[in-house]
Amino acid sequence: MTHSHGVIMRVARHSAEQQKRFCMNLAAPFIMQVPPFKAALMETMPYIDLLVGNESEAAAFAASEGWPSDMSIADIAHRISGMPKASGHCARTVVITQGADPTVVATNGHVTKHPVIPLAKEQLVDTNGAGDAFVGGLLSQLVVGKDWAEACRAGNYAANTIIQRSGCTYPELPSFTWA
């Protein structure tokens, strides 16, 4: 949202016209706090089919919309998922990660929670790249037709792997297995 909003809108409109899924990440709480960035996000929102973020970004979005400060992450995700869309080819899905707490998925009026992989505090090395790794794992399963539970499991695996290493690095061989 901070750069090339015109390009984002062109891709968003094209995706809607071609009935392709358009995915966005909330990116950072400041996006919702800086008026030009928030305006760009809200212009894009009707085109977003999959929105991913973390609990801090979801709370910042809710605050920027004037929603009650005591809303749960599940309620925020549900409310965002029901916001108006430009196309009807698919429901909007909102996925919110919550660190050590379950990942929330809201779509079609339903909210589900998906467990993360437990990790002892002493195993936590570096959280940089965890959100990007989660999205990579999530999308890797969605593009091959897996359901939200399996996609979240892959996303949580990728994030869990990243946070146990310095920098955004992976082991030579993954240990993820498909359900």
Model-assigned labels for residue ranges:
Residues 82-93, 100, 117-179:
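Conserved post-catalytic alpha-helical subdomain immediately downstream of the catalytic base
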Residues 1-113, 117, 168-179:
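Ribokinase/PfkB-type carbohydrate-kinase core domain
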